[in-house]
Amino acid sequence: MKPPILIIIMATIMTGTMIVMLSSHWLLIWIGFEMNMLAIIPILMKKYNPRAMEASTKYFLTQATASMLLMMGVTINLLYSGQWVISKISNPIASIMMTTALTMKLGLSPFHFWVPEVTQGITLMSGMILLTWQKIAPMSILYQISPSINTNLLMLMALTSVLVGGWGGLNQTQLRKIMAYSSIAHMGWMAAIITYNPTMMVLNLTLYILMTLSTFMLFMLNSSTTTLSLSHMWNKFPLITSMILILMLSLGGLPPLSGFIPKWMIIQELTKNNMIIIPTLMAITALLNLYFYLRLTYSTALTMFPSTNNMKMKWQFEYTKKATLLPPLIITSTMLLPLTPMLSVLD
């Protein structure tokens, strides 16, 4: 793709997201979503092959269905309230339809089926945009309508998303699919807290984006797409491979890494709201995520593949691309746990 075209497309994606975030009028929000969706399809099809075309088609159909459902919910709400303002949701059916549409855009269970398939069919760069930037717009709308959301519906979706995110990643060897299932689980944690403490959801989303960006950028540095290729990278890029494994443990929520902060704070907040069973179930199902990350770490770092002496020396001669943003991203993605007491202002 030519640089001027790429710049225009990326600018359109960013503009669409900003329109959604800054609007209080449902029609403008819908226009922002459509701009975002139509602009990202060329990014998904950057590597022109049947897999990318299939992934783009699946993404388009899912997002178009979600947009249609959102507009139906907005129309029903307009009939009852007579207003396009986002804060005036007076009809419970409209609220359920809007929530369903936004969760479909995010890839929450039971509308999660498109996320692993689309992520697997596209490049690492496109996958990074899909699993980070594309989550911001729907989450910002959920944040704004959180007082009107049906809590029981969203909590059920959150619990099943955490379960599906852990269960689906267990037998995966493709790194992009592992990241996709991890994304589903993280979205579940965010959905669980949004009706009780929306500000904590913003913290969770920020940390998730930081960790996912860092992980994808490291995958791109050493061109790893499977667990086997990651294992072979140990001799060529030992430092980068070590960073990937630490980031994956952070994504799994293992203390003392940054990924433990949102899980800790969400469980604490739900417990304060007299909910015991749901946070307990979520904590237990989160162990599935941690298990497949630990298994990946063990198979990559603690068991060495048979290699010659020449292979062991490769790291001294390999040229590593410069990545200026990576060091601060990795530090924030792994070492923020000591700052947790400062986050008490979110309560």
Curated annotation (Swiss-Prot):
GO MF, one annotated term: NADH dehydrogenase (ubiquinone) activity
Subcellular location: Mitochondrion inner membrane
Reaction catalysis annotation: a ubiquinone + NADH + 5 H(+)(in) = a ubiquinol + NAD(+) + 4 H(+)(out)
Keywords noted in UniProt: Electron transport, Membrane, Mitochondrion, Mitochondrion inner membrane, NAD, Respiratory chain, Translocase, Transmembrane, Transmembrane helix, Transport, Ubiquinone
Enzyme Commission identifier(s): 7.1.1.2
Location, primary (coarse class): mitochondrion
Disulfide bond is among the record's keywords: no
GO cellular component: mitochondrial inner membrane; respiratory chain complex I
Domain of life: Eukaryota
Membrane topology: Multi-pass membrane protein
GO biological-process terms attached to the record: mitochondrial electron transport, NADH to ubiquinone; mitochondrial respiratory chain complex I assembly
Signal peptide as annotated in the record: none
Spans traversing the lipid bilayer: 3-23, 25-45, 66-86, 111-131, 149-169, 178-198, 201-221, 237-257, 274-294, 325-345
Subunit structure: Core subunit of respiratory chain NADH dehydrogenase (Complex I) which is composed of 45 different subunits. Interacts with TMEM242.
Function (record text): Core subunit of the mitochondrial membrane respiratory chain NADH dehydrogenase (Complex I) which catalyzes electron transfer from NADH through the respiratory chain, using ubiquinone as an electron acceptor. Essential for the catalytic activity and assembly of complex I.
Protein name: NADH-ubiquinone oxidoreductase chain 2
Top-level taxonomy: Eukaryota, Metazoa, Chordata, Craniata, Vertebrata
